[in-house]
């Protein structure tokens, strides 16, 4: 079995509904609404570890005290911090970004640098929406994944 922790306010309500609809009402899921960096720092202090991380950070945001989050400035420190949460033998680390200025190569470099000690492989690609009228793809962001060998 596995356990899951979801900490995004907008996703918690939606995910709870999906868990109930999927027969997972009593599954070991931690529902949290919290600042991500503060959550990660607390988990590190508690000695908790995770086998996988799925991250979908916002492009821009403001905290309750006016703190500003800009993905271009904050993503590297956040990923570096999150690597301290990983178990000794992690399965994967996934980052989705719907910021068109954050290219797949940046996510690949970031994951390759911060996950190097785990000896896995890195993949990154553009996220896009197909345009039916012309067969082209409208770029919407990037996805990067590190996975164990």
Question: What is each stretch, according to the model?
Answer:
Residues 1-6:
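Short, small-residue-biased leader/transition segments that mark boundaries at the very start
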Residues 9-52:
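S-adenosyl-L-methionine
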Residues 11, 33, 50-81:
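Mobile active-site "lid"/loop adjacent to the S-adenosyl-L-methionine
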Residues 15, 33-35, 54-57, 64, ...:
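Active-site proximal loops enriched in glycine and acidic residues that flank catalytic Cys/His/Asp
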Residues 41-44, 64-66, 105-106:
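Short, well-ordered secondary-structure micro-motifs
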Residues 86-88:
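Helix-to-beta-strand junctions that scaffold the AdoMet/dcAdoMet cofactor pocket
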Residues 90-149:
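C-terminal catalytic and target-recognition region of SAM-dependent MTase-like enzymes
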């Amino acid at each position: 079995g596995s356990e899951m922790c979801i900490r995004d306010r907008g996703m918690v309500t939606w995910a709870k509904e999906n868990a109930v609809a999927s027969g997972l009402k009593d599954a070991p899921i931690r529902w949290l609404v919290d600042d991500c960096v503060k959550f990660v720092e607390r988990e590190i202090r508690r000695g908790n570890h995770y086998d996988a991380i799925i991250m979908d950070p916002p492009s821009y945001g403001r905290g309750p005290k006016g703190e500003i989050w800009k993905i271009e400035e904050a993503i590297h420190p956040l990923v570096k911090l999150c690597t301290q949460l990983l178990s000794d033998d992690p399965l994967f680390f996934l980052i989705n970004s719907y910021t068109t200025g954050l290219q797949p190569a940046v996510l690949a470099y970031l994951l390759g640098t911060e996950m190097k000690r785990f000896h896995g492989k890195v993949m990154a690609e553009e996220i896009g929406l197909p345009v039916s009228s012309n067969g082209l793809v409208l770029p919407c962001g990037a996805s990067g994944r590190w996975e164990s060998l």
